């Protein structure tokens, strides 16, 4: 029986790894997979046969376990997020492996959008220290700012390559103190620090004998113990993605509304409101995936993809949203949002954009750039009128027609969107709604 089969159903932790180029991220992921026995025998055989300039003697180059991503980067292929899966006796994990290069910041946003936690990797040898004060790299600040923008629940700062600084407690403390200052500036509250050597395996799965001064848990133990908050008990948000008929014909009496429950829960017999029409109806049936197919269930909750059938005949189409009846939810046309800009062509009020939020797509006009984050100083420039690639800024938008939304902090599923350039069809930005009004 595999380790995954032995795992109790304690839920899944999704986390991202973020670090500058050559911080040892691939080796860290490889070490987690290898030491948690998540490497298949054929992968292990290939690893033992592979030798390159980074290996010494019988050492395994664990970074090769993620070298598919590196090979793509070297060939100039557009990099997407690579997902890795492993499990221990306590938990299942999904790693969103994002590239470290600055030009791939957009891919980190993609990976972080569904994550519960982030591992921020810092190379202990690349941080300059003057008079006991460490100067963190700009990418570390950028990654941390994105983690804050996307409201990830937990941050683990893995200070790597401790073997190359003689496992120095002083160096660890200098970097930790610098990051504590950064975290306070950004408003990150749940931050944990682990000194590691991914290459040697120190403090990855087991405690390191070479750092007796560190009294905390190794990295894997921290990951296993992180609490995961769900939105199952929040207000219902169910964007309708598809109107389904049993046989596809217009004469078919069956009509089900398919989509993903972004937050809250729904039960058979609940009275829901359909927005934006505000018509009410009763949930007659919920159909959900089960092993071997689908089945009617009495109850469904956030994160599940389901089909809902209503008792009353009401007009529902793609882009509508089911909410709890009586809840004061007003569609919005004016938004204030934080944008992470992805495209080489800067944001411009003169260009036409489409805003895609849940299952709705509407035209959006840029009202102006209110501020842009300087990742070097963590200050906000208010004299900028455009966003360039990898910029993070606060922007005002006016929509052609209203959408049903929430602030990102309240409901990430309905508070997030992407912007699409109408002319190029490029996805140019990810947005997080901070304020909205009619």
Question: Where do the model's predicted regions map?
Answer:
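G-domain G4 guanine-recognition motif of GTPases
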Residues: 47, 123-125, 153-173, 193-211, ...
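Residue-level signature of catalytic and energy-coupling elements of molecular machines
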Residues: 22, 28, 47, 76, ...
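Conserved Switch II/interswitch segment of TRAFAC-class P-loop GTPases
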Residues: 91-94, 98-104, 113-173
């Amino acid at each position: 029986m595999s380790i995954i089969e032995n795992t109790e159903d304690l839920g899944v932790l999704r986390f991202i790894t973020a670090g500058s180029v050559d911080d040892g991220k691939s080796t860290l992921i490889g070490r987690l997979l290898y030491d948690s026995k998540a490497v298949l025998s054929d992968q292990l055989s290939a690893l033992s046969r592979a030798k390159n300039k980074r290996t010494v003697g019988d050492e395994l180059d664990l970074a090769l376990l993620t070298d598919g991503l590196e090979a793509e980067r070297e060939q100039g292929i557009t990099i997407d997020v690579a997902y890795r899966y492993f499990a221990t006796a306590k938990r299942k994990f999904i790693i969103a492996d994002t590239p470290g290069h600055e030009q791939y910041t957009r891919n980190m946003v993609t990976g972080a959008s569904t994550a519960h936690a982030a591992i921020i990797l810092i190379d202990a040898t690349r941080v300059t220290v003057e008079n006991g004060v460490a100067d963190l790299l700009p990418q570390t600040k950028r990654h941390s700012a994105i983690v804050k923008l996307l409201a990830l629940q937990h941050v683990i700062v893995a200070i790597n390559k401790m073997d190359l600084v003689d496992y120095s407690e002083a160096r660890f403390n200098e970097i930790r103190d610098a990051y504590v200052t950064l975290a306070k500036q950004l408003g990150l509250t749940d931050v944990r620090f682990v000194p590691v050597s991914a290459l040697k395996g120190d403090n990855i799965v087991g405690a390191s004998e070479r750092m007796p001064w560190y009294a905390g848990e190794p990295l894997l133990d921290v990951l296993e113990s992180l609490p995961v908050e769900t939105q199952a008990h929040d207000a219902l948000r169910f964007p309708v993605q598809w109107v389904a008929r049993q046989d596809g014909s217009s004469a078919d009496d069956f009509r089900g509304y398919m989509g993903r429950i972004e937050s809250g829960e729904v039960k058979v017999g609940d009275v829901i409101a359909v927005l934006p029409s505000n018509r009410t109806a009763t949930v007659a049936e919920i159909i959900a995936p089960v092993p071997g197919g689908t089945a009617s269930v009495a109850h469904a909750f956030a994160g599940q993809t389901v089909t809902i059938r209503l008792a009353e005949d009401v007009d529902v189409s793609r882009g509508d949203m089911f909410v709890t009846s009586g809840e004061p939810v007003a569609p919005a046309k004016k938004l204030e949002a934080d944008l992470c800009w992805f495209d080489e062509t800067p944001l411009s009020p003169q260009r036409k954009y489409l805003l895609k939020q849940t299952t709705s797509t509407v035209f959006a006009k840029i009202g102006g750039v209110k501020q842009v984050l300087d990742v070097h100083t963590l200050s906000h420039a208010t004299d900028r009128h455009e966003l360039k690639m990898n910029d993070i800024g606060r922007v005002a938008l006016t929509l052609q027609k209203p959408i049903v939304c929430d602030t990102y902090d309240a409901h990430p599923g309905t508070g997030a969107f992407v912007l699409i350039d109408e002319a190029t069809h490029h996805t140019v930005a990810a947005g997080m709604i901070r304020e909205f009004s009619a």
